[in-house]
């Protein structure tokens, strides 16, 4: 099996899990518990962070493109992300959570963008945060492979993590859950160096 075909299969698996199974769990099991704690009440709503929140998509695409010609790195990273999404989906299936989002008047570009995110991204499947888990896993992976590139991604990842709270898509415990999931996956990264794939 050619490497190009394998890379496409890995990418399609990630897309299928995220756009298919993840969304299915959201629809089938839409109501969950609220994990908000006292700290969350002190975190302000900052609609401007909606732009940063959406940067995780081009970030992931760019990193995949960066490693497209390095099959070993591409394969390991893909398998790690598949594991992240799969574990998160299993958690959502048995422990559904939701965020109580504020009602925001669409008065400018940023509030309209935030409301658009609210419209298309349901307020459940929140613990652990996939935004946090995916971007953190990628940043750690890239930093180990290429420290200079990683040093660019780490600040962006930090801002993306903050954005999940500043636009009220996640609460603090969701962030902790996402970081823990990323840590477990990256700590066991050798598992994903499967030469047969």
Residues covered by each model-derived region:
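Membrane-interface loops
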Residues: 27-39, 68-148
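Alpha-helical transmembrane segments of integral membrane proteins
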Residues: 6-14, 75-83, 149-153, 173
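N-terminal transmembrane-helix/juxtamembrane module of multi-pass inner/ER membrane proteins
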Residues: 1-60, 97, 105, 114
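Aromatic-anchored segments of alpha-helical transmembrane domains
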Residues: 18-24, 85-93, 155-168
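Hydrophobic alpha-helical transmembrane segments
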Residues: 50-63, 79-82, 86, 134
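Membrane-embedded catalytic cores of phosphoryl/pyrophosphoryl-handling enzymes
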Residues: 115-197
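Membrane-helix interfacial "entry" motifs
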Residues: 3, 7, 42-46, 68-73, ...
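Hydrophobic faces of alpha-helical transmembrane segments in multi-pass integral membrane proteins
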Residues: 13, 17, 79, 83, ...
């Amino acid at each position: 099996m050619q490497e190009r075909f394998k890379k496409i299969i890995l990418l399609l698996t990630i897309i299928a899990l995220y756009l298919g199974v993840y969304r299915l769990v959201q629809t089938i099991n839409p109501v969950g518990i609220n994990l908000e704690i006292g700290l969350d009440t002190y975190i302000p709503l900052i609609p401007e962070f909606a732009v940063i929140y959406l940067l995780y998509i081009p970030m992931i695409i760019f990193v995949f493109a960066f490693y497209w010609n390095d099959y070993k790195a591409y394969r390991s990273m893909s398998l790690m992300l598949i594991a992240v999404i799969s574990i998160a989906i299993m958690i959502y299936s048995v422990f559904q959570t939701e965020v109580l989002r504020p009602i925001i008047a669409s008065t400018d570009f940023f509030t309209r963008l935030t409301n658009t995110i609210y419209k298309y991204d349901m307020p459940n499947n929140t613990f652990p945060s996939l935004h946090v888990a995916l971007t953190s896993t990628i940043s750690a992976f890239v930093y180990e492979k290429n420290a200079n590139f990683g040093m660019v991604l780490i600040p962006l990842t930090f801002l993306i993590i903050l954005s999940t709270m500043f636009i009220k898509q996640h609460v603090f415990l969701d962030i902790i859950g996402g970081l823990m999931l990323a840590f477990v996956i990256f700590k066991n990264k050798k598992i994903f160096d499967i030469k047969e794939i």
